[in-house]
Every structure is written in C-alpha cells, then in structure tokens.
Amino acid sequence: MRTIASVQLDKRRPALILTRRSKLPLLTWLTVAPITSTIRGITSEVAVGPRNGLDHDSVVSCDNITTVRMSAVGDTIGLLFDDQEPALARAISDAFELDLMSE
C-alpha cells in the first residue's frame, strides 16, 4: 500500500507518495503524484475515491509527478491499495512512454 497525504504543491492538495517507504527517514526530498478531481480519462491517470480516503472521485495524475521537500508533506489522508498498484505502474509507464514489454 502507498500513502496518500496532504502535500503543499500549487496549493495544499492530496498526493500519492511514490518514494519507497523504507527510504523516507533518510531523505529530505520525496517524489509524489498529485491527486485532482479533474478527470480527463487518459491512460496516465489512476482512479481513486472514497475507498482511498478521499471525499470524492479523483485521479492520481502521473503526468504531473514531482519532487517536494519532506516538510511539504502533511497529514495522511488515505491509501492506494495493493490491487491498484498495477494501474499505477501502467499509468507511470504511459506518462513517460516507457516500453516495458521489450525486456
């Protein structure tokens, strides 16, 4: 499972913490994907909602992955569950046009 937390970006908004949990205590910066209620229906989005601790249906925007200072991260809002991890991997792959099939 991955944490969804309140993060100071363009404004305070929910974001999915992408940095691996085991390294968080060692880092000053971490990588996040912002969560937005603007749903475009594109392959670089991951659907999230009340099940994940959010107030309404939203998406993880993998086109807008960014790095923030640890101090920008606030309270935990919810979680991205293990069964959503494949969708996250596909969305990140699509956002960066990674060809994972050629290995």
Model-identified regions with their sequence ranges:
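C-terminal terminal-subdomain/extension
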Residues: 52-103
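Compact nucleic-acid interaction/catalytic patches
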Residues: 6, 10-50
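Loop/turn positions that initiate beta-strands
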Residues: 1-4, 62
